[in-house]
Amino acid sequence: MNLQEMNARKEKIRNFSIIAHIDHGKSTLADRILEQTETVSKREMQAQLLDSMDLERERGITIKLNAIELNYKAKDGETYIFHLIDTPGHVDFTYEVSRSLAACEGAILVVDAAQGIEAQTLANVYLALDNDLEILPVINKIDLPAADPEMVRQEIEDVIGLDASEAILASAKAGIGIEEILEQIVEKVPAPQGEVDAPLKALIFDSVYDAYRGVILQIRVIDGSLKVGDRIQLMSNGKEFDVTEVGIFTPKAVSRDFLMAGDVGYVAASIKTVADTRVGDTVTLASNPATEALKGYKEMNPMVFAGIYPIESNKFNDLREALEKLQLNDASLRFEPETSQALGFGFRCGFLGLLHMDVIQERLEREFGIDLIMTAPSVVYHINTTDGETLEVANPSEFPDPTRIENIEEPFVKAQIMVPNDFVGPVMELAQRKRGIFLTMDYLDANRVNIIYNIPLSEIVFDFFDKLKSSTKGYASFDYEISDYRPSNLVKMDILLNAEKVDALSFIVHKDFAFERGKVIVEKLKKLIPRQQFEVPIQATIGNKIVARSDIKALRKNVLAKCYGGDISRKRKLLEKQKAGKKRMKAIGSVEVPQEAFLSVLSMDEE
């Protein structure tokens, strides 16, 4: 293909993604677009075709982004090449969204005709605007009885400030308005910029590990072109590889002769190690390298940390391999080895948020068959010591001696909560209970409010989202971003079982709530830990001070069963003997802590 043909082809390319809040019909719309452009035959079609992970289908959420090439014959008789990049909509996967948007020129904004704009929609729209994307509003689900497209149109104009007079009314489920959406993509989304004859620059926006071909990179080519046999260089570390295959996804991988500026596809170059390929890195040709890298993604910092331990200690290496493979597709997962006296060897992992943590845990158990124990999630605290040092600590067991601590700072988030009017009371009550600091409250329209709070991340980490959903009957939508670190009156609480500290049960708590929390947890553990042959005291302590205690009574055999009547001194002798035995047992006995006990530390305020 000569330069002229390449440029002509580039003019026909449209790269776009679909952004929406959870459940506004994004994956269904993607399915319809695939059907309409006949990318997928009716026979192969199944619901949520792009959500290829079992987990994604079960939970009905999109976790990983997907990129697909479609051909569309427009009304003007020309055939256009569409690249649809599917994105997740959940708070924790904002990073995945920012990666997909960096590879696009336009975005379809899907808003539910019955629900209107939600917090997460807003967050994603701002990401799209930051990337200078052309945004096409689509009002979806207009066939619902509760749909009110005109109200939503007004909302898009008022809240986001987009002109919604030409917003397309559609129903992805019934297939209404799909043709119009495709035509608008042709008209409004700009063709990719970029020079076909410039040195190669391509952005890695995802990577997948294939047991046979090594690491497969998903790339968006910005400048230049790439073919099999080229030697590529990664700009962040200068490593070079020979390209063995290039191609595109039409959900399935299809190999091609070359990829050129504007294309979205994949490259296999027998890259062995996961660590070599950073998402957000720039790929260029070793023979004719680009002078400067593309501006990459910002590094996402994990906000929530938890210990992951294999239940069978000989599975430690399997767990490491599994985490390395997951990290390959999941740029935001971090982990490092750690040991715990109670749980043996494991890893301290960093996640973007709770759903992310859940999904990783489930994938480890499901895809790699490893049984896990997870410890209570914690956040990163900044500890200023008396000798002027600042420590960053994510694991409660690494806290320094209380006498060395000058003060402790914890991360606060700026939380946006959108709720119907009727639920403002319960939401504010919940936020106050979680030590929230009220900032502002805006009325979006007659019946929806946007409330903004500063809340400590550690309070959100536990169960804030579930509590929010249950106190608003599921109507609230919630989005947060990290704002800053602030000093707080925090203490570390340890749990002692049979006078031995269980490091995996330690947690950080605000001093005002320490007493209640200690009481709740001690009672909870009492129910969960099975009775032993000897009495087990459970104590919650702060430093050397015991704040709560409860005892698990011993199981005992009735040693008097065989004394039919008889002398009291005989009975006393048997009882004393039993007592001495229990005492000896207690001195050397150790207590098994079941997995539920670790989780009970999490779901603290449920009673």
UniProtKB/Swiss-Prot annotation:
Catalytic activity, as annotated: GTP + H2O = GDP + phosphate + H(+)
GO biological process, one term: positive regulation of translation
Subcellular location: Cell membrane
GO cellular component, one term: plasma membrane
GO function terms (MF aspect): GTP binding; GTPase activity; ribosome binding; translation elongation factor activity
Disulfide bonding pattern of the chain: none
Keyword Hydrolase carried by entry: yes
Ranges where the tr-type G domain occurs: 11-193
Main location: membrane
InterPro entries the record matches: EF-4, EFG_II, EFG_III/V, EFG_V-like, EFTu-like_2, G_TR_CS, LepA_C_sf, LepA_CTD
Domain of life: Bacteria
Protein family: Belongs to the TRAFAC class translation factor GTPase superfamily. Classic translation factor GTPase family. LepA subfamily.
Task performed by this protein: Required for accurate and efficient protein synthesis under certain stress conditions. May act as a fidelity factor of the translation reaction, by catalyzing a one-codon backward translocation of tRNAs on improperly translocated ribosomes. Back-translocation proceeds from a post-translocation (POST) complex to a pre-translocation (PRE) complex, thus giving elongation factor G a second chance to translocate the tRNAs correctly. Binds to ribosomes in a GTP-dependent manner.
Stored PANTHER family: TRANSLATION FACTOR GUF1 HOMOLOG, CHLOROPLASTIC, TRANSLATION FACTOR GUF1-RELATED
Protein known as: Elongation factor 4
Gene source species: Lactococcus lactis subsp. lactis (strain IL1403) (Streptococcus lactis)
Gene that this polypeptide is encoded by: lepA
